[in-house]
Amino acid sequence: MEVTVIGAGLAGSEAAWQLAKRGIRVKLYEMRPVKQTPAHHTDKFAELVCSNSLRANTLTNAVGVLKEEMRRLDSVIMKAADSCSVPAGGALAVDRHEFAAKVTQMVTNHPNVTVVREEVTSIPTGPTIIATGPLTSQPLSEQLQALTGEEYLYFYDAAAPIVEKESIDMEKVYIKSRYDKGEAAYINCPMTEEEFERFYDALISAETVPLKEFEKEIYFEGCMPIEVMARRGKKTLLFGPMKPVGLEDPRTGKRPFAVVQLRQDDAAGTLYNIVGFQTHLKWGAQKEVIRFIPGLEQAEIVRYGVMHRNTFINSPKLLKPTYQYKEREDLFFAGQMTGVEGYVESAASGLVAGINAAHYVLGKELVVFPQETAIGSMAHYITSANPKHFQPMNANFGLFAPLDEMIKDKKKKNERYAERALETIQNFLKKL
């Protein structure tokens, strides 16, 4: 039997891989390049459109635990990410072009996968995984709305500008990771209070791209436009993306008033993205505002920040923790449209949907990952949260099943969560 997977983003690619490696034939549909989205630039699978960072790689962070669980489950996304990582302190960042090319190659070359480059405008019959992402095309969105009977929720993800390293005035900046964790991987642009005030005034008065009347302004906190943060007040920036804590200037030994960080975006180290500066400003306005950042006065912007709609379904009402649609047992959903937020989380949901679609086809019992694991905690959250107030969520230890013992020290507590998660996933592998 064959399974149809719609969408070759992180979730769809992972789902197709998990099915194929279990001997299931997969028909993988991807509409790019026949039909592009407002945010994608290539026809590659698993294209990273926001940041090139897959976030923390350490086991004291929930997303670090999630990655390690996925490695143990032979994730194609983690194989590709680990093989084309770039320096990023304690985080896992990748060369986005190499990463997408690697995922495309591995999935396409699998003998059980057939790739079809066309738009899907209706929900197929037979075993299907829908992983069309936050930018699902209008015809399919309408079909999904008809299927679910639920109103869609809208919010906007925003991507940060990328600049050429050669154009940065290195005399005005310094290289350092916060609290000197890992290798010194970030370019830091320090600001005095006066410089910050000038930057802030320019930012809050800059012109944004107008939103359509019918689109509600709901932003996910983890990817909020810098100008929206700024309008909440100066402290939102100073305690957010521009916080100077742990970034003392090695040339003076003093902590700057504010710091703008740049993170390496490609393996060659020629491109850097401005961390936390996802934006919906007009391109001309972006250029003007960036000029107020010390060291970036003459910066060459190779990609301006863009903003796009994000769409997700009301998973607590519609899905089981297997990522299976409650009203149709051979239909699965995966990726950001389920309300998991983040690259790694999306891929992990695809992994679960792929495994369970394989089990469905093979007549095996579907699996619910334990809430003690990062993978299971995400599946539990999106299917058990209050449907009236459901919002997307990143992986975090707050979603894990509580520990049996009381541990006050946060680091030790997180280490215990991680230890328990990896013990649990190791035992759980026997069911797969």
From Swiss-Prot:
It is found in: Cytoplasm. Its cofactor is FAD. It holds the Pfam family GIDA. SUPFAM superfamilies: FAD/NAD(P)-binding domain. Keywords: Cytoplasm, FAD, Flavoprotein, Methyltransferase, NAD, NADP, Transferase, tRNA processing. It catalyses: uridine(54) in tRNA + (6R)-5,10-methylene-5,6,7,8-tetrahydrofolate + NADH + H(+) = 5-methyluridine(54) in tRNA + (6S)-5,6,7,8-tetrahydrofolate + NAD(+); uridine(54) in tRNA + (6R)-5,10-methylene-5,6,7,8-tetrahydrofolate + NADPH + H(+) = 5-methyluridine(54) in tRNA + (6S)-5,6,7,8-tetrahydrofolate + NADP(+). Its EC number is 2.1.1.74. GO terms for molecular function: flavin adenine dinucleotide binding; tRNA (uracil(54)-C5)-methyltransferase activity, 5,10-methylenetetrahydrofolate-dependent. FAD binds at G7, A8, G9, L10, A11, G12. One of its GO terms (biological process) is tRNA methylation. GO terms for cellular component: cytosol. Catalyzes the folate-dependent formation of 5-methyl-uridine at position 54 (M-5-U54) in all tRNAs. Belongs to the MnmG family. TrmFO subfamily. This is Methylenetetrahydrofolate--tRNA-(uracil-5-)-methyltransferase TrmFO. The gene is trmFO.
